[in-house]
């Protein structure tokens, strides 16, 4: 079902629904998982130190980060120190600050051509396009913005690689067991050989299926050539953009424009 929250979602709360979530207030460092859309009429605000790259604070830091996973669109007034994964678009009114965003569609901050909005710090990834007034900040905060690769397929690919390793280990162990039982038939009590063979056959089938999933992912990871990144006002020094597989770093502030791929290179117009 769907859920309407009259006030705020406070820190450490966990919300899981199959439909949509609408929050009339703000959302702190909580967890929201929704099958549909998530709308936060206030802002989404994790705690400031949570997203800093401090390996020692990783578990505690995750607890202080706002975390949203939704199948549809995510809409909010602003997003700070949050981890967001949306199946479709991420629409923000004012600013995305020090957050990790993955969108299966586009990320838009403010209305088209609005000068006052910004993406500052963090890592923002979308399949189709990313748009804001300013990308980066005058203080030179490292900011990475990517468009043209499916962010979810990228995350999924690492998960599949781990799964394959585990399955291959299991298969090798079973093969050793079957060899051992073949040379010591007296140790093969009950239906142990049959069970091991069945499991081995099933693993073989699962690995073939994994190959198919990986092949599909590689197709999904083909860069989208019409992807764009737009900064209506400016790209700041310290920002890095990636369109498809091409990257460009800004060493100093540059007037805004639309970055796209032309003949395999990033061109800003």
Regions found by a protein language model. Name each.
Residues 8, 24-26, 43, 95:
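Surface-exposed loop/turn segments connecting beta-strands in extracellular beta-rich domains
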Residues 40, 45-269:
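Intrinsically disordered, low-complexity terminal regions
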Residues 1-12, 16:
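Intrinsically disordered, low-complexity linker/loop segments enriched in Gly/Pro
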